[in-house]
């Protein structure tokens, strides 16, 4: 099975922005085990800006574009160093792929990306994809890595997209602010009420949130309906969004 796995900054790091080593080690071990079982893994990982914030001991995520790009350049190096080291311990070779929105929107560049990623999978490599925050601007950015994960999953014809989060799933309200919020175990369709319950942006170090994850699920569901593929989208320990499969 070809599986796309997306992980966000808040899942990879502590609140300080520093890497949560134990969690990342466990994640790399699980993905390595899935690969050892014969699955093809495409790993979409946020975290460049968040790790750069931690490494530079900044108080908060920068808001101006130039500083965000600079911090991303710092953090991406450390992020890939950690992944290369941890996956190497399980005898897996990783490859770094950095994309902008134009790489997915422009037909020739999209095809080049798809061909290259297919070749990496043929070679038994574990591709690690992130948005190229060092050069991305509002005009060329994908926007958030939940959307990027969905677009990559559709592009590589993944049979399953798993979106990892620091929240157990979709709730009727933000469980961190409302103790009475209830888990929604299954989402048969993305209604206006469901989208409203998702709220806004997630952590202070990331760009996503539950709304972005629902948008990602919608992209996969639309692709499954259009192409009649068995693309399924869901959330780790959370609600299942139904696609064609």
What are the functions of these language-model segments?
Residues 1-217, 221-222, 229-244:
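Nucleotide/pyrophosphate-binding catalytic subdomain
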């Amino acid at each position: 099975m070809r599986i796309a796995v997306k992980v966000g900054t808040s899942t990879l790091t502590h609140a300080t922005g520093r890497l949560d080593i134990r969690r990342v080690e466990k994640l790399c071990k699980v993905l390595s085990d899935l690969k050892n079982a014969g699955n093809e893994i495409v790993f979409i990982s946020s975290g460049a800006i968040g790790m750069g914030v931690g490494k530079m001991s900044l108080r908060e995520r920068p808001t101006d574009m130039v500083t965000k790009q600079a911090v991303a350049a710092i953090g991406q190096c450390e992020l890939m160093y950690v992944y290369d080291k941890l996956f190497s311990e399980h005898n897996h070779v990783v490859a770094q792929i950095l994309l902008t929105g134009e790489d997915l929107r422009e037909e020739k560049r999209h095809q080049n990306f798809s061909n290259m990623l297919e070749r990496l999978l043929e070679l038994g490599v574990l591709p690690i994809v992130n948005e190229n925050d060092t050069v991305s601007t509002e005009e060329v950015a994908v926007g958030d890595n939940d959307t990027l994960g969905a677009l990559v999953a559709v592009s590589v014809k993944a049979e399953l997209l798993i979106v990892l989060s620091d929240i157990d799933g979709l709730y009727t309200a933000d469980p961190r602010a409302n103790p009475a919020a209830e888990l929604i175990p299954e989402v048969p369709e993305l209604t206006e009420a469901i989208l409203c319950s998702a709220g806004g942006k997630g952590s202070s170090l990331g760009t996503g949130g539950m709304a972005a994850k629902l948008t990602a699920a919608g992209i996969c569901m639309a692709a499954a309906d259009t192409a009649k593929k068995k693309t399924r989208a869901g959330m780790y320990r959370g609600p299942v969004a139904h696609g064609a499969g």
